[in-house]
Amino acid sequence: MSQIDKASRRQKIKDRSRAAVAGTAVKPRLCIYRSLSQIYAQLIDDSGSTTILAVSSMSKENKELKGAGVEVCRTVGRQLGEKAMAKGITTVVFDRNGFRYHGRVKALADGAREAGLIF
């Protein structure tokens, strides 16, 4: 499968899932982006088009962590969950952004659940 086919396939999946997933101020959307070397997660209020909270493997508190392996992703998920709970957010809508729910994406979701987020 060529790179163009992979990109267009992911875009189709992303568009299809975004049609069904929307976040509000009470129940924001947990959006994940996974690159080859890093992982990013943010809570988004789609009704106000604002980012409520963002955490990544490149954040200041994650300087000692190397790369974006499964354990790093689990740590990022825990940090996101803890910060969300501190802001009073307990439930979210999970948006995997066209990525498979496997490996690093699953680890981030599990870390967020460990911190107390419900989705």
Curated annotation (Swiss-Prot):
The keyword tRNA-binding does not apply. One of its GO terms (molecular function) is structural constituent of ribosome. GO terms for cellular component: cytosolic large ribosomal subunit. Keywords: Ribonucleoprotein, Ribosomal protein, RNA-binding, rRNA-binding. One of its GO terms (biological process) is translation. The keyword Protein transport does not apply. Belongs to the universal ribosomal protein uL18 family. This is one of the proteins that bind and probably mediate the attachment of the 5S RNA into the large ribosomal subunit, where it forms part of the central protuberance. PANTHER family: 39S RIBOSOMAL PROTEIN L18, MITOCHONDRIAL (PTHR12899), LARGE RIBOSOMAL SUBUNIT PROTEIN UL18M (PTHR12899:SF3). NCBIfam families: L18_bact. Part of the 50S ribosomal subunit; part of the 5S rRNA/L5/L18/L25 subcomplex. Contacts the 5S and 23S rRNAs. This is Large ribosomal subunit protein uL18. The lineage of its organism: Bacteria, Pseudomonadati, Chlorobiota, Chlorobiia, Chlorobiales.
